[in-house]
């Protein structure tokens, strides 16, 4: 459950390390984002020489949340951190690698490129 001012780890190799959620996209008064939702975020921490710099405003898709996600079969999945992957306007990842596991719910939202790059899909 991601909302404004939430800080997230970055799960790709764009050079950003931490993001701050500015806005949850989808509806005029939408408050929370979960796995597979797109957010607008500011880069708060970045490595030198990366694709994105500190202070850049980017779009990102949430790939892991600490809030448990209920699945249709009744099971829940929860991760140890909140993480997002920076995407471009075509909803493809800006980076070339994805770090850490991602949730299966991304497949339903048509983020197939992220699914294929991820080392593990839970």
UniProtKB/Swiss-Prot annotation:
Q: Would the keyword RNA-binding be found if you checked this record's keyword annotation?
A: yes
Cellular-component GO terms for this entry: cytosolic large ribosomal subunit
Question: One GO molecular-function annotation for this sequence?
Answer: structural constituent of ribosome
CDD domains annotated for this entry?
A: Ribosomal_uL14 (cd00337)
The GO annotation for biological process reads: translation
Recite the UniProt keywords alphabetically.
Ribonucleoprotein, Ribosomal protein, RNA-binding, rRNA-binding
Position of the signal peptide: none
The superkingdom listed in its UniProt entry is: Bacteria
State what this protein does. Answer: Binds to 23S rRNA. Forms part of two intersubunit bridges in the 70S ribosome.
Family (UniProt)? Belongs to the universal ribosomal protein uL14 family.
Q: How does it assemble?
A: Part of the 50S ribosomal subunit. Forms a cluster with proteins L3 and L19. In the 70S ribosome, L14 and L19 interact and together make contacts with the 16S rRNA in bridges B5 and B8.
Record's protein name: Large ribosomal subunit protein uL14
Q: Which organism is it from?
A: Heliobacterium modesticaldum (strain ATCC 51547 / Ice1)
Q: What is the lineage of its organism?
A: Bacteria, Bacillati, Bacillota, Clostridia, Eubacteriales
